[in-house]
Amino acid sequence: RERYDYELLKWTADRLKALREERGLSQETVYFHTNINIGRIEIGKSNISLTSLSILCKYFGISIEDFSKGISTEQAG
């Protein structure tokens, strides 16, 4: 059994990148404020933890629930 759901990781990476770019933020700025290397997440080099996702959602001013809108049932499991 695979340990990673690559489609879900890609969706998450794309969603985080879109949120960052919509706010006009660089990867460096996000790292400075959160201590999370969002660049590694965006290119699929890092599996994001729930804690990191929560921190990033708070930083971007959205709830995890709003962040996850658009995930299909197939992507989520």
Task: Please describe what each predicted stretch is.
Residues 1-22:
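A short, Lys/Arg-rich alpha-helix, primarily the initiator
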Residues 17, 26-28, 54, 65:
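Residues within the helices of the helix-turn-helix
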Residues 43:
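Short, conserved catalytic or interaction motifs in soluble domains
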Residues 22-40:
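Short alpha-helical DNA-recognition segment
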Residues 49-66:
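DNA major-groove recognition helix of helix-turn-helix/homeodomain DNA-binding modules
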Residues 61-77:
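Short C-terminal boundary/hinge segments that cap the last helix of small helical domains
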